[in-house]
Curated annotation (Swiss-Prot):
GO biological process, one term: eosinophil differentiation
Record protein name field: Interleukin-25
Effect of gene knockout: Mice display mitigated inflammatory responses and Th2 responses in house dust mite/HDM-induced asthma model.
UniProt entry keywords in alphabetical sequence: Cytokine, Disulfide bond, Glycoprotein, Secreted, Signal
Gene3D superfamilies assigned to the protein according to its UniProt record, in alphabetical order: Cystine-knot cytokines
UniProt record similarity statement: Belongs to the IL-17 family.
Species annotation: Mus musculus
Amino acid sequence: MYQAVAFLAMIVGTHTVSLRIQEGCSHLPSCCPSKEQEPPEEWLKWSSASVSPPEPLSHTHHAESCRASKDGPLNSRAISPWSYELDRDLNRVPQDLYHARCLCPHCVSLQTGSHMDPLGNSVPLYHNQTVFYRRPCHGEEGTHRRYCLERRLYRVSLACVCVRPRVMA
């Protein structure tokens, strides 16, 4: 269980970044350093931990990609296999987030590991990740590189899960 939690935390983009954020810094322009202070180097160079997801697979639903492997990473052994797509934004912390993309419209049969089972649908599982966007501070004149951090929730697909289809009455 702990391995799955650690794996999902890694994919969500849990990065350790040291930023000097003033208390109550979620609104513009209170985030900006005073004129005597230089902007922290971290604000100018956003760094994020290097996360290497498994190799992305094909972007279409092919029968070959709709197989559950017997070994390998979690995303390829699942009955709702998925691949990862990189979402990079240089003005966001973390800069790199990986989204899961379901490889099959239906779930892979547990009996065969290769045939799709139309009784289950493969759907993404989402999480709202807290991210920070770097924005120029309002009211600052000149060519100073001063930035404010704007906190937002960002929807990230973590994995794909097998669910029963919804029945419309």
